[in-house]
From Swiss-Prot:
Residues 249-453 are annotated as: N-acetyltransferase. GO terms for biological process: cell morphogenesis; cell wall organization; lipid A biosynthetic process; peptidoglycan biosynthetic process; regulation of cell shape; UDP-N-acetylglucosamine biosynthetic process. Pathway: Nucleotide-sugar biosynthesis; UDP-N-acetyl-alpha-D-glucosamine biosynthesis; N-acetyl-alpha-D-glucosamine 1-phosphate from alpha-D-glucosamine 6-phosphate (route II): step 2/2; Nucleotide-sugar biosynthesis; UDP-N-acetyl-alpha-D-glucosamine biosynthesis; UDP-N-acetyl-alpha-D-glucosamine from N-acetyl-alpha-D-glucosamine 1-phosphate: step 1/1; Bacterial outer membrane biogenesis; LPS lipid A biosynthesis. Its EC number is 2.7.7.23, 2.3.1.157. Binds 1 Mg(2+) ion per subunit. In the N-terminal section; belongs to the N-acetylglucosamine-1-phosphate uridyltransferase family. This is Bifunctional protein GlmU. It comes from Histophilus somni (strain 2336) (Haemophilus somnus).
Length: 453
């Protein structure tokens, strides 16, 4: 098998997006379009990924800083052929070169593998598609079934405009052939540009075969020029993801109201209500229920967990049989053991909650360790920040913390301790102690309320 490299054209401005952001950085499923294409190139085990860039160079490099791409600058956007010419110095003669586009994000590894497998020796394999309305696309010209040329819309005659088979722009040939044909391109056309499609005619002139492979899924080769097209591809992508999950046994209250912006793995009997968003890498165990409006990002959820509506979980771990929400927030570093309860308007950050413990109402637990079978009352705050540094709160097992208490870190509360409601704790608490700092209650008889003047 020949070595393979990929060229991704990503230099365009995207005027019709009406945005300062380069077009290829607009997102599908929470990921820049060009990143989808790069990920597909990686799946092909490409030896090199050449990224042709121009407009928005700094933003592109910022967003793709961790990607293994060869940055190839195109100072002027003079057509697809001109873009490919910039990458020619990096081609090896005996490698296959696949040409892709940063604004065609849903092209699949399987489709490209099929295309590559059909490439004739020293020839070209071209990805095409039949459209009911081919307006705007380059028409595929055939003679006796053989592809002889591609004519762009603005250069086509009336008979050619009737053709419904169109060029997707995706093609593969070897490095030596591309180098030879790209050197012979001219811009003698209505646009004054160097068309990559002209290499089809050059290949025929040289007696080399051009094979057309039809894409099975039209949406794989749909490009994005405006936000309507972007939204259509987003919905198509989400439908495909939901179909896979449904067939794998996940129940959705409404498949049209779910967004997957990453990777979801799951056990059996998972149920997901409406308007749930999954981001990053999320792992769900068996018998997990996710209520309406929840957002889960980079988290692991064990078996028999109930996540009630409008809870947000990010970079957290949740143990078996936990109950979360509604309106709970688990921030990075939150770890809930089995049989824990975290209730409404509770925020937990960088803290471990022991098995059987409950934090049910209006509470902030940050930079803390809470032992087993504790009860943290409503309105409790771990005061972990002094304006410059963070400090930790350690709570043992079987601790009861009364409502509206403040735990000023650094602080240790030993097992079995009880903190009375309304207490501000500033010193360590020993085992089985009761701590209370409440102001003494006063009773004033025959109190007269103030009267309005």
């Amino acid at each position: 098998m020949n070595k393979l490299s990929v060229v991704i054209l990503a230099a365009g401005k995207g005027t019709r997006m009406y945005s300062d952001l380069p077009k290829v950085l607009h997102k599908i499923a929470g990921k820049p379009m060009v990143k989808h294409v790069i990920d597909t190139a990686k799946k092909l085990s490409a030896a090199q990924i050449h990224l042709i860039y121009g407009h928005g160079a700094d933003l592109l490099k910022q967003h793709l800083a961790d990607e293994p791409v060869n940055w190839v600058f195109q100072s002027e956007q003079l057509g697809t052929g001109h873009a490919m010419q910039q990458a020619v110095p990096f081609f090896q003669d005996d490698e296959n070169i696949v040409m892709l586009y940063g604004d065609v994000p849903l092209i699949s590894k399987e489709t490209l593998e099929c295309l590559i497998s059909q490439k004739p020796e020293n020839g070209i394999a071209l990805l095409t598609v039949n459209l009911d309305n081919p307006t705007g696309y380059g028409r595929v010209i055939r003679e006796n079934g053989t592809v002889t040329a591609i004519v762009e819309q603005k250069d086509a005659n009336p008979e050619q405009l009737k053709i419904t088979e169109v060029n997707t722009g995706v093609m593969v040939s070897d490095g030596a052939s591309f180098r030879k044909w790209l050197a012979r391109l001219d811009n003698n056309n209505a646009q004054g540009e160097y068309y990559m499609t002209d290499v089809i005619g050059l290949a025929n002139q040289d007696g080399f075969k051009v094979v057309a492979v039809q894409a099975k899924d039209l949406m794989e080769v749909e490009g994005v020029n405006n936000r309507l097209q972007l939204a259509n591809l987003e919905r198509h992508y989400q439908r495909k993801q939901v179909e896979k999950l449904l067939l794998a046994g996940v129940t959705f209250a409404d498949p049209a109201r779910f967004d997957l912006r990453g990777e979801l793995t799951h056990g059996k009997d998972v149920e997901i209500d409406i308007n749930v968003i999954i981001e990053g890498t999320v792992r769900l165990g068996n018998n997990v229920f996710i209520g309406a409006g929840c957002v889960l990002k980079n988290c692991t959820i064990a078996d028999n967990v109930e996540i009630k509506p409008y809870s947000v979980i990010e970079d957290a771990i949740v143990g078996n049989n936990a109950k979360i929400g509604p309106f709970s927030r688990l921030r990075p570093g939150a770890e809930l053991s089995e049989n824990t309860h975290v209730g409404n308007f509770v925020e937990i950050k960088k803290a471990q909650i022991g098995k059987g413990s409950k934090v049910n109402h209006l509470t902030y637990i940050g930079d803390a360790e809470v032992g087993h079978h504790c009860n943290i009352g409503a309105g409790v705050i771990t005061c972990n920040y002094d304006g410059a540094n963070k400090f930790k709160t350690l709570i043992g097992d079987n601790v009861f913390v009364g409502s509206d208490s403040q735990l000023v870190a650094p602080l240790t509360i030993a097992s079995g301790a009880t903190i009375g409601a309304g207490t501000t704790v500033t010193k360590d608490v020993q085992e089985n102690e009761l701590v209370i700092t409440r102001v003494p209650q006063r009773h004033i008889s025959n109190w007269q309320r103030p009267k309005r003047k």
